[in-house]
Amino acid sequence: MSKKSSVEKNEARKALVKRFAAKRKALLEIANNDALEMEERFEARLKLAELPRNSSATRIRNRCGMTGRPRAYYRKMGISRVALRELGNRGLIPGLVKSSW
């Protein structure tokens, strides 16, 4: 089980990303537009740098929905391998059977 503070910190980052997504996207489009003047593009970069660091989507960490574990995360299911194995052994995931050969 992960520390509650780590999970909460990640949730706060998700909220910030959602809040600043439109503004960040607009500034990036201006900054990467070669048709605009260099001065205007530079100002867009400065405004982008003023946004909160945690409003960038790259700072979000995928975490298990059950345990908060940050590693061995299966995107399709939203859980870690440990939780997947546990639920699979209990028969709570339809279609998942233990391999045998």
Swiss-Prot record:
Pfam families: Ribosomal_S14. The keyword Hydrolase does not apply. GO terms for cellular component: cytoplasm; small ribosomal subunit. Keywords: Ribonucleoprotein, Ribosomal protein, RNA-binding, rRNA-binding. It comes from the Bacteria. GO terms for biological process: translation. GO terms for molecular function: rRNA binding; structural constituent of ribosome. SUPFAM superfamilies: Glucocorticoid receptor-like (DNA-binding domain). InterPro entries: Ribosomal_uS14, Ribosomal_uS14_bac/plastid, Ribosomal_uS14_CS. Part of the 30S ribosomal subunit. Contacts proteins S3 and S10. Belongs to the universal ribosomal protein uS14 family. Binds 16S rRNA, required for the assembly of 30S particles and may also be responsible for determining the conformation of the 16S rRNA at the A site. This is Small ribosomal subunit protein uS14. It comes from Methylobacterium radiotolerans (strain ATCC 27329 / DSM 1819 / JCM 2831 / NBRC 15690 / NCIMB 10815 / 0-1). The gene is rpsN.
